[in-house]
């Protein structure tokens, strides 16, 4: 996901998305371990999407604390 797409989500949707991405990452790692993975670049994409989402969540938390 792009950062713009992530920013359009509500905070609750964003938390849910992080959980979904973590589950997908777990499944991808399992596929990698069993040599069933079709696209190994998907691991990188999912990890980066999780990082983007967590960064935006943290920005929102800090913004609320300052307000």
From Swiss-Prot:
An example Gene Ontology biological process: translation
GO molecular function terms attached to this record: structural constituent of ribosome
Keywords, comma-separated and alphabetical: Ribonucleoprotein, Ribosomal protein
GO cellular component, one term: cytosolic large ribosomal subunit
Coiled coil start-end: none
Pfam families according to UniProt: Ribosomal_L29 (PF00831)
Domain of life (superkingdom): Bacteria
Stored InterPro entries: Ribosomal_protein_uL29 (IPR050063), Ribosomal_uL29 (IPR001854), Ribosomal_uL29_CS (IPR018254), Ribosomal_uL29_sf (IPR036049)
Protein biosynthesis listed as a keyword: no
Signal peptide residue numbers: none
Protein family membership: Belongs to the universal ribosomal protein uL29 family.
Annotated HAMAP family: Ribosomal_uL29 (MF_00374)
Xref: NCBIfam families: L29 (TIGR00012)
Protein name: Large ribosomal subunit protein uL29
Species the sequence originates in: Moorella thermoacetica (strain ATCC 39073 / JCM 9320)
Lineage: Bacteria, Bacillati, Bacillota, Clostridia, Moorellales
